[in-house]
C-alpha cells in the first residue's frame, strides 16, 4: 500500500487554495490542500508499526513552527504547476530531512521546495495566463503548524489520514 507524510494547513488556507484547485488541479478530489513532506512510498502491513513509531519520534523532535505563504510561483519549465510558495523555515526543512533518513528512502528526484499546489498539469497557455494574473494578487498568510499526518492511498487514488502526530514534546 502507498503511504505519504504531509501537513494540512488551516481551513482558511485550504479554502483559499481550493478556490484555485477546483479549477486548475485534477487531484482536487483526491486529497485536500497540503504540503508534502514525504512523497508516496510503499509499505507492507508488517512494516507499518515501525514507520508509525519513527514518524512519531520525528514529530516529537520538532517544535511547532510558523508556516508563511507569501507569493504564487511555478515549477516551469520542469512542470506546469502553480503553487503558493512557503517561506523556508528550519523546522520545516528538518521535518523533510528527517523523513528522508532511515528507514525512509531519500528523494533523489527533486529538491525540497516548500509549497502548496494550486494547479497542475496545465497547458503552457493556462499556466502563463494564470501565473500572470495571480502574481498581481497579494497572497499573504501565516499560521502555526503543530501537527503532521501519515496518509495512505485508497484503491480509488484518494488519500486519507492514517494517523496525526503532534509536533514537539508532549506536556
From Swiss-Prot:
The keyword Magnesium does not apply. The keyword Hydrolase applies. Keywords: Hydrolase. A motif (HXTX 1) lies at residues 34-37. Pfam families: 2_5_RNA_ligase2 (PF13563). GO terms for molecular function: hydrolase activity, acting on ester bonds. A motif (HXTX 2) lies at residues 115-118. It comes from the Bacteria. It is an enzyme of class 3 (hydrolase). Its EC number is 3.1.-.-. The active site is at 34 (proton donor), 115 (proton acceptor). NCBIfam families: PRK13679.1. HAMAP family: 2H_phosphoesterase_YjcG. Belongs to the 2H phosphoesterase superfamily. YjcG family. This is Putative phosphoesterase BH1439. It comes from Halalkalibacterium halodurans (strain ATCC BAA-125 / DSM 18197 / FERM 7344 / JCM 9153 / C-125) (Bacillus halodurans).
